[in-house]
């Protein structure tokens, strides 16, 4: 590993940034559907709120990835947090004045910000060689554990003893705006840019980078790329659709207090990240392939159990399992996609992956909301289970892809 690259320092900073982002995400996951329904009154389209957010994230992912490859990781990530802060302010205004237009505009800005922050894993993958890449990504993602604790601790009290009304959401959204600006300031201290670190590592390993980045049509045909994308798309789509509808299920279907959503979402985010250091080492040891399908299988088990569970503690356990399965599948997919690309190609491939994954998640959130309203929780749980299980079975039948050397 070349000297003087501040890899440990940059890893710690990116982990801190993710902690702040995940704290904000815990609010969004808990109240996106609720915010949309309370402001618009469209209960039958409760999945439209998360769908707007996810569609904006998806459609901006590929341009964001290309921008990262051109301008570097840090400037783009910082811009994303500024947009996120603005989105929170606009959403807060919408809840205060009961403006559906403002809420939708805020969700769009939050979605663009979400696509940027999700691509922080590009920077994480940049800073480590292939044999340590899953662990390196895991070290950055571990910061999210603290965000899972911070989010409910900060936002939960803001909902205590409050009626379920749009006006009770204004202050939490404003608090999230301030946190996003803090994250922007923190990420600007990352030096050198992780893309430059990746280039230095390639030179140090005597790897010759291509003169120009290959087109996406060529990159996706490389060994292991499509299976990794399938796992990432399925795991992300199932995870975000179930996660974003959980708040409405808990409050409206199971008739729990609004504040009870935050421990559940906190448990889910802990599942996503609490064991990430162990998961990273496990993936590097057992290989990317088994981890891709194994994570989806864990998600399927967690989803089907939602059919019978109504209590807050048990729902929290199942959402923890959903997050854990996503962690296993998504980290291994990210590592495999990073293995298959040079530093100049990595951002756009992960951006393409996030484009398809985000559109899948948006579609599933919208369809899941309709299924939930018309057919109930059982239909949502069975549908999510099948969507996780089918690709897991397909991936189990594939021969493992060779691990790239660069």
Predicted feature locations:
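Juxtamembrane intracellular "pre-TM" segments in multi-pass secondary transporters
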Residues: 1-8, 192-229
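Hydrophobic core of transmembrane alpha-helices in multi-pass small-molecule transporters
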Residues: 19, 100-115, 314-328
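Short amphipathic helix-loop junctions that connect adjacent transmembrane helices
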Residues: 31-43, 244-259
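Intracellular juxtamembrane helix-capping segments at the cytosolic ends
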Residues: 32, 115-128, 328-341
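Helix-to-loop junctions at the C-terminal end of transmembrane segments
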Residues: 60-72, 275-287, 372
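C-terminal ends and interior cores of transmembrane alpha-helices
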Residues: 82-96, 298-310
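Helix-loop-helix hairpin linking two adjacent transmembrane segments in secondary transporters
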Residues: 102, 130, 140-189
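C-terminal membrane-cytosol helix-exit motif in multi-pass small-molecule transporters
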Residues: 177-202, 393-399
